[in-house]
C-alpha cells in the first residue's frame, strides 16, 4: 500500500544521495536486512561498488543477509521475546524500570569488507 510505497521512495532517495560523486559517507548502517539488500542492489545499478566505495551493514541476520553476504547484527530474538514476556508477567510496580543487557553479535560479511579466502 501507501506505506510500502513511501518506504521504497525513502530508500530510493538514500540510493540517489549515496550515488552522488561528492558523497562523504563511507559506511551505511541500515535498519534491517531487506532494506539493506534493496539499497545494495540500487547502488550496484548505479555503478557503486560494495564494499570498495561504501560499506553496508544491517540488523537481523536473516537468511537474506546470509545468502547475499550482508554484514548484519544478529540479535537474540528468542531471548528478547522470552525476557519481554517475563517482564510483563512479573511486573509488580508500573513505574519501576528494570534494565537488562542483551548481547548481540556482528556477523561480518562481504558487504562491509573484502574477504580474501586464500589469505586466511
Describe the residue ranges of each PLM region.
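Flexible loop/turn connectors
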Residues: 8, 12-120
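Short beta->alpha junction loops
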Residues: 1-9
Amino acid at each position: 500500500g501507501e506505506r510500502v510505497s513511501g518506504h521504497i521512495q525513502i530508500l530510493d532517495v538514500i540510493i540517489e544521495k549515496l550515488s552522488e560523486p561528492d558523497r562523504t559517507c563511507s559506511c551505511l548502517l541500515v535498519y534491517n536486512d531487506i532494506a539493506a539488500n534493496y539499497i545494495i542492489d540500487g547502488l550496484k545499478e548505479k555503478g557503486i561498488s560494495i564494499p570498495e566505495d561504501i560499506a553496508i551493514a544491517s540488523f537481523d541476520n536473516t537468511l537474506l543477509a546470509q545468502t547475499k553476504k550482508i554484514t548484519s547484527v544478529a540479535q537474540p530474538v528468542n531471548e528478547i521475546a522470552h525476557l519481554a514476556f517475563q517482564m510483563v508477567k512479573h511486573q509488580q510496580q508500573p513505574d519501576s524500570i528494570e534494565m537488562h543487557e542483551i548481547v548481540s553479535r556482528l556477523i561480518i560479511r562481504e558487504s562491509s569488507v573484502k574477504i580474501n579466502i586464500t589469505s586466511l
